[in-house]
């Protein structure tokens, strides 16, 4: 019997792709206020490509940006990291049905939670500005416990905290490895959100696929 429905955050409840587009406007306003609009667009494309949808070694990413661009006053990697961690959450773009979905699951008697990879400051800021934390019985951020998806331990840790077995949990996420393989290995029942950087990649016949987050309600009755 399913007792909990758990979610990834980025590209599952939050439209990270659109949030990143909004964040880049603040980034260039703060760090490159004097460059032309054409140069901003060129550098935005650099950030999209080298940022790899957020699946990147951030120190290497920042070093690439610093070294490959001309700067009037070049920031340090530490400054770029602090800016990203403290500003990105101000640009949350939550899928329109995310709050309604979580509220409906709560009304149906399910426990609801989020398991997300990322630095603690960044992810908690995003969660705080998302408006979704109030629906959650548990929030697990990998940076808080030093366990990262796809390690099955982060999924079993969450189930244990809820007083449940992994088999009693559904997990919804977009990443074919971090979310789907990880939750399967832990014993959870995954649902694939087919969106974002990994859309249409490595879909599995044994895992339900949804195109919109509200479609979870068609699977979890």
Residue ranges and their predicted role:
Residues 2-96:
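N-terminal helical cap/lid subdomain that shapes the substrate entry/recognition surface
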Residues 1-5, 18, 33, 99, ...:
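Asp-based, Mg2+/Mn2+-dependent phosphohydrolase catalytic module
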Residues 53, 92, 114, 170-171:
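Residue-level marker of alpha-helix boundaries and capping positions
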Residues 110-112:
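Short beta-strand/loop segments at the ligand-binding rim of alpha/beta enzyme cores
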């Amino acid at each position: 019997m399913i007792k909990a429905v758990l979610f990834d955050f980025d590209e599952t409840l939050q439209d990270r792709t659109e949030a990143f587009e909004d964040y880049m406007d603040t980034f260039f306003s703060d760090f490159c206020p004097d460059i032309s609009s054409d140069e901003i667009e060129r550098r935005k494309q650099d950030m999209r490509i080298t940022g790899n949808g957020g699946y990147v070694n951030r120190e290497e990413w920042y070093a690439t940006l610093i070294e490959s661009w001309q700067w009037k006053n070049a920031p340090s990697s530490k400054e770029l990291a602090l800016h990203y961690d403290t500003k990105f959450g101000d640009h949350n773009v939550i899928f329109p049905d995310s709050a309604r979905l979580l509220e409906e699951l709560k009304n149906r008697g399910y426990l609801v939670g989020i398991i997300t990879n990322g630095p603690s400051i960044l992810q908690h800021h995003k969660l705080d500005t998302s408006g979704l934390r109030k629906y959650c019985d548990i929030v697990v951020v990998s940076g808080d416990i030093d366990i990262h998806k796809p390690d099955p331990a982060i999924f079993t840790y969450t189930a244990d905290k809820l007083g449940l077995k992994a088999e009693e949990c559904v997990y919804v996420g977009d990443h074919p490895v971090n979310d789907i393989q990880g939750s399967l290995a832990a014993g959870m029942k995954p649902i694939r959100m087919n969106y974002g950087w990994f859309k249409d990649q490595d879909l599995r016949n044994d895992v339900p696929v949804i195109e919109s987050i509200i479609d979870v309600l068609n699977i979890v009755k």
